[in-house]
Amino acid sequence: MNAPVKPSHLIKGATGEWEMVIGIEVHAQVTSNAKLFSGASTAFGGDPNSHVSLVDAAMPGMLPVINEECVRQAVRTGLGLNARINLRSVFDRKNYFYPDLPQGYQISQYKSPIVGEGEVVVDLADGTSFVVGIERLHLEQDAGKSLHDQHADMSAIDLNRSGVALMEIVSRPDMRSSEQARAYVTKLRTILRYLGTCDGDMEKGNLRADVNVSVRRPGEPFGTRCEIKNVNSIRFIGQAIEYEARRQIGILEDGGGIDQETRLFDPDKGETRAMRSKEEAHDYRYFPDPDLLPLEFSQGLVDALKADLPELPDQKKARFVTDLGLTSYDAAVLVSEHESANFYESVLADLADARRDGKAAANWVINELFGRLNKQGLSIEASPVSASQLAAIIDLIGEGTISGKIAKDLFEIVWSEGGDPRALVEARGMKQVTDVGAIEKVVDDIVAANPDKVAQVRAKPQMIGWFVGQVMKASGGKVNPQAVNDLLKAKLGL
């Protein structure tokens, strides 16, 4: 039975409405010092062919030996995806010819992958969430790289990537919009980074997506899909899907048919172009690799790895909401990047009262800090304001030493000049005025100067905010707004 189609997910064509169906295969480079079947380095940026073993170059007589750390990383990832771990899996040869594939085949897993079905819960910007099913995760070798701009009449081959371990994470076709697809890949990358199993660096090619797109009339069976190969940014994933869906709709509405094919996305033109006809599994002539025994490990290994998993984004988000009273949205923003969550937790650790000021800390991190970082194009690691400095500013507010307005001025000073917030408050005379007599004098002056406003506020008590603002302005923001509010109510008989 087909699930109801959300109107926002439908695309209007010339002859009616269409629905996208999207599935994604993510190729994530395993975080490991050595390759999947050799001891060669996986370091990025070396000279061409400087990280190549005899196994990677497919020299005769060289046999592959499995890297245990890559197996552990795949199991950790499967556990992080709430997936079934297969205690026995098999490596297969995927046969095809390409110049940068020296063996003439890729060692992969076909019928018996290391990880089975799982799922990812994905949050959207509007506060809703949806589930993407994971069909499987398998280990495989990466290929080398063909360089076509080194010589005018020939191509060069760099085998540094050849044999690097990849996890291919295959989703079910559960996405119905480019927004959902972008959100899914973003969430998956976040999980991998929390686990430490892939750094998710798409610019270096450490995370790449093959995006399968088809269109259909709502309620009809799946259409013929096209695969958009090796999309290397979240933004490009969205652009590629939007273009490809429109392209297919145009063909179908003109009476044509969709060819099942592999396509490439051209980010300069914002369009996809045909690469080759899409292969079926039988085209690759899979068979078990005779040089590798089946991969077997115990449930005890799985249990030990599970016990050692870090707190993952969904768990951290739930804790922030339950323990600190954060909104679901704020908690989701904070956990969306591992570094952001770590920064926020460092702020909490330095606060005098984390339970009291946890929500205030979230507001400061999200609105003030993230806003400033985004404006200047800086990462959280490059923040001029440290977690301990931000915690000190929040403590100064919480204990009544400075007002919220002065705190923003103090934040600007720390951002630009650095320094200890407490020392800066003392040195620059930024302390909040707490003397009731001094505050009362300012209030009396404002009330005496505005008799018309006094009459208005007595008729409409909610206008008291105008008086509070005037007092704050007259005092340079150095008085406690709540004290001003209470004093005004007493003076005006509200």
Swiss-Prot record:
Oligomeric state and interaction partners are given as: Heterotrimer of A, B and C subunits.
EC class? ligase
| EC code | 6.3.5.-
Q: Which GO terms describe its molecular function?
A: asparaginyl-tRNA synthase (glutamine-hydrolyzing) activity; ATP binding; glutaminyl-tRNA synthase (glutamine-hydrolyzing) activity
Q: Give the protein's biological function.
A: Allows the formation of correctly charged Asn-tRNA(Asn) or Gln-tRNA(Gln) through the transamidation of misacylated Asp-tRNA(Asn) or Glu-tRNA(Gln) in organisms which lack either or both of asparaginyl-tRNA or glutaminyl-tRNA synthetases. The reaction takes place in the presence of glutamine and ATP through an activated phospho-Asp-tRNA(Asn) or phospho-Glu-tRNA(Gln).
Reactions that this protein is recorded to catalyse: L-glutamyl-tRNA(Gln) + L-glutamine + ATP + H2O = L-glutaminyl-tRNA(Gln) + L-glutamate + ADP + phosphate + H(+); L-aspartyl-tRNA(Asn) + L-glutamine + ATP + H2O = L-asparaginyl-tRNA(Asn) + L-glutamate + ADP + phosphate + 2 H(+)
Tell me the protein family, please.
Answer: Belongs to the GatB/GatE family. GatB subfamily.
**Listed name of the protein:** Aspartyl/glutamyl-tRNA(Asn/Gln) amidotransferase subunit B
**Which keywords does this chain's UniProt record carry?**
ATP-binding, Ligase, Nucleotide-binding, Protein biosynthesis
Tagged with keyword Transport: no
What GO terms describe the biological role, i.e. biological process, of this protein?
Answer: glutaminyl-tRNAGln biosynthesis via transamidation; translation
